[in-house]
UniProtKB/Swiss-Prot annotation:
Family (UniProt): Belongs to the NAD kinase family.
UniProt-listed HAMAP family: NAD_kinase (MF_00361)
Cofactor(s), names only, from the UniProt record: a divalent metal cation
Ligand binding (NAD(+)): D61, G62, R66, N136, D137, R147, K164, D166, L201
Class of this enzyme: transferase
Protein biosynthesis among keywords: no
Listed name of the protein: NAD kinase
UniProt function note: Involved in the regulation of the intracellular balance of NAD and NADP, and is a key enzyme in the biosynthesis of NADP. Catalyzes specifically the phosphorylation on 2'-hydroxyl of the adenosine moiety of NAD to yield NADP.
Main location: cytoplasm
GO BP term (any one): NAD metabolic process
Source organism (scientific name): Dehalococcoides mccartyi (strain ATCC BAA-2266 / KCTC 15142 / 195) (Dehalococcoides ethenogenes (strain 195))
Keyword field contains Ribonucleoprotein: no
Alphabetical list of Pfam families matching this protein: NAD_kinase, NAD_kinase_C
């Protein structure tokens, strides 16, 4: 079923690197073409994914986020093995990695399809626009100086509010258990296409989180004399200036995970994971 498989690992986690070697050896023994590389090598990964039919990650949610950005716009399914902490997106424990891979190779499992956002960063000056895919969240926030910034929000080209706050988060359903949740946002069912808008420590005005329909377009406009930053999925980070706009909408692209657990896995594990219990269900 799978003729070419890529293994993407967390390069700073020795256990993730060692497991990647064992998985590659298993695929070699089965005569399946495979390649391995670091999740931190986006350019190299992009050059290797041609004709790859399955991606296996060894790491945590951060490894998955980097992998997703590297393989897009290709919608290659991901089988994820948790060597991180909470692991909301991961599927297997390290102990079950080989057996789980064998099950997937035998045709078992189902596809868990996740919605993405796409963002266009529009500088206020003549600098070129930039485009991003977003799996978890986009954050416009203050810089290192502890001063609030103003972020004006338009929804579908209509003014909504101006946050005077530490910043604002626009999140997918997948990202709803991350920074948005920590800032007081709701948790969405992971396959939802809705979009979450959440202010970060607002000083005055609207302090609530808002769930927007999937067809919404959201503009965040920076208005500050102080340092401000844009963070995409927690690892693409850049300074932004007053007058810059981040325009976000739902993407037509998806990220697909291979699951071996029943389709109610999210609800069964949600409370445990949000309480900070990092133990995998496969370790119990």
């Amino acid at each position: 079923m799978y003729k070419k498989i890529g293994i993407i690992y967390h390069p700073l986690n020795p256990a993730a690197c060692e497991l990647a070697v064992r998985l590659a050896a298993k695929l070699d023994s089965l005569g399946i073409e495979n390649w391995s590389d670091s999740a931190w090598q986006a350019d190299k990964l992009a050059s290797k994914i041609q004709n790859t039919q399955l991606i296996v990650t060894t790491g945590g949610d951060g490894t998955i986020l980097r992998t997703a950005h590297a393989i897009l716009p290709h919608e290659i399914p991901i089988l994820s093995i948790n060597l991180g902490k909470v692991g909301f997106m991961t599927e297997l424990s390290p102990e079950d990695a080989i057996l789980g891979l064998e099950k997937v190779l035998a045709g078992n499992g189902w596809i868990d399809e996740r919605n993405l956002l796409e963002a266009e960063y529009l500088p206020h000056n003549s600098a070129p626009a930039r485009q991003f895919f977003i799996m978890n969240d986009a954050v416009v926030a203050r810089g290192q100086i502890a001063r609030v910034i103003c972020v004006s929000v338009d929804i579908n080209s209509h003014p909504f509010t101006t946050y005077k706050a530490d910043g604002a988060i626009v999140s997918t359903a997948t990202g709803s258990t991350g920074y948005s949740y920590a800032a007081g946002g709701p948790v969405l069912q992971p396959n939802s296409a809705d979009i979450i808008l959440t202010p970060i420590l607002p000083h005055l005005g609207r302090g609530y989180s808002l769930v927007l329909p999937a067809d919404s377009t959201i503009d965040l406009k920076v208005n500050t004399w102080h340092e401000a930053t844009l963070s995409i999925d927690g690892f693409i980070n850049m300074p932004v200036s007053s007058g810059d706009i981040l325009r976000l909408r739902r993407s037509a692209k998806k990220i697909n995970f291979i699951r071996l657990r029943p389709d109610n896995y999210f609800y069964k594990e949600l409370d445990t994971k949000l309480k900070g219990n990092n133990e995998s269900v496969y370790d119990r």
